[in-house]
């Protein structure tokens, strides 16, 4: 079945629409913390001193039947280590030059109960009993390349590493990307090439950029693909996934530019889309895909300050979005936790009425459908109705129909359902 998502504005004919407003469907949060920073826990994981943004990469490995999470963190941070939780509300966070980043790993059999296994790979304070995969790396992106034929290369990784050889004789002449972001990497389904979504700076603003590679070793220079609106809405990071042939992005949007604003120095999660990877726009301008929790640091909810998400994991009729939520402002003290929310498949945006007392009219550009079958994804209230008309190029109505009867599962604010259009007599009934 060919689907057309209202998310794609190219589907619509704006010259023949009225009283219609595009709305963003919100992700329903679990509100359950699956795991968190364990520096102050008992027993303590001393290397989990500050997750900061976390930049989670969540993968369900269908062959191994396991969920994997790869997340960035600070394994050394003197100010976080030296300031007890109860004292942080009284003190300004001061990051020092000695901070060291790393990459850690967690896993789960069901996506709900997570463990941090002792990997025995990286030495930390005299032993290897930890879940650290790498130290001195930042903003790591990990993906499972299901088209890779070599089983040892199925999991691929891109990261930022600062390295000095120590001799003082070798000058690095290669690229030096800023890349202090979630360096999100995937294989483009259209071209087979690898794509890296990273970040650059232009005119003092954070901007999403794209690099490409055919071999995962040699990469093109970063090219701007998406910027926000001034200082107030900057693209901090943007994981990308493909849905129904459309590129979807979940940008974390950083707010600065006005210290008097309530959202100053916080990070919201938005939804963006593109049909070609080069030109992006927000699905619904200024609306958050995952709402931050209520309150402020240190008493607020665990995700009241900053949100950074992973590309979704599909399961049944839903998409699950795992994310790192911080309870403080971006540059301040904050404790970060790992959680998730879900969205019904196909339900990214929906049209409703601007004026509830009047009907809304949506008109598409011409498209083909074969046979007599046409279905509409509907979530309508008790007092609502939907009608369908087929027009010619002059806008004259030729055929009328209505979606079939609503079921008990379809409720206002509940599940949406695909309803087959029942045409008027004489057309395929």
Positions of PLM-derived features:
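Carbohydrate-active catalytic/glycan-binding domains of CAZyme proteins
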Residues: 1-429
């Amino acid at each position: 079945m060919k689907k057309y998502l209202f998310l794609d504005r190219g589907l619509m004919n704006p010259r023949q629409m009225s009283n219609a407003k595009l709305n963003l469907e919100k992700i329903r949060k679990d509100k359950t913390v699956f795991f968190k920073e364990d520096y102050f826990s008992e027993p303590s994981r001393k290397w989990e001193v500050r997750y900061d943004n976390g930049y989670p990469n969540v993968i369900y490995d269908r062959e191994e039947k396991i969920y994997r999470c790869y997340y960035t963190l600070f394994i050394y941070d003197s100010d976080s280590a030296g300031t007890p939780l109860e004292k942080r509300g009284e003190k300004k966070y001061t990051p020092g030059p000695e901070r060291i980043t790393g990459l850690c790993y967690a896993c789960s059999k069901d996506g709900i109960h997570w463990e941090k296994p002792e990997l025995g790979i990286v030495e930390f304070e005299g032993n290897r009993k930890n879940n650290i995969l790498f130290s001195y790396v930042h903003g790591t992106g990990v993906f499972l390349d299901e088209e890779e034929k070599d089983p040892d290369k199925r999991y691929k990784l891109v990261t930022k590493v600062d390295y000095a050889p120590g001799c003082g004789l070798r000058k690095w002449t290669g690229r030096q990307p800023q890349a202090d972001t979630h360096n999100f990497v995937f294989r483009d389904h259209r071209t087979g090439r690898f794509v890296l979504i990273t970040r650059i700076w232009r005119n003092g603003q954070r901007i999403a950029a794209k690099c490409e590679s055919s071999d995962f070793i040699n990469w093109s220079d970063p090219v701007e693909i998406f910027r926000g609106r001034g200082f107030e809405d900057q693209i901090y990071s943007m994981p990308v996934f493909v849905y129904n042939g459309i590129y979807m992005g979940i940008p974390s949007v950083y707010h600065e530019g006005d210290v008097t604003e309530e959202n100053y120095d916080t990070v919201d999660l938005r939804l963006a889309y593109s049909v070609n990877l080069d030109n992006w726009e927000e699905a619904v301008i200024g609306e958050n895909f995952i709402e931050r929790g209520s309150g402020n640091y240190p008493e607020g909810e665990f995700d009241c300050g900053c949100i950074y998400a992973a590309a979704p994991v599909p399961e049944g009729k839903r998409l699950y979005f795992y994310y790192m939520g911080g309870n403080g402002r971006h540059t301040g003290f904050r404790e970060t936790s790992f959680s998730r929310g879900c969205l019904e498949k196909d339900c990214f945006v929906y049209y409703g009425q601007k004026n509830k007392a009047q009907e809304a009219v949506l008109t598409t550009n011409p498209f083909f459908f074969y046979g007599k079958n046409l279905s509409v994804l509907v979530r309508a209230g008790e007092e609502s109705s939907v009608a369908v008309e087929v027009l010619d190029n002059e806008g004259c109505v030729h055929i009328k129909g209505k979606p079939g009867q609503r079921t008990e599962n379809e409720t206002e604010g509940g599940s949406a359902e695909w309803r087959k259009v029942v045409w008027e007599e004489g057309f395929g009934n």
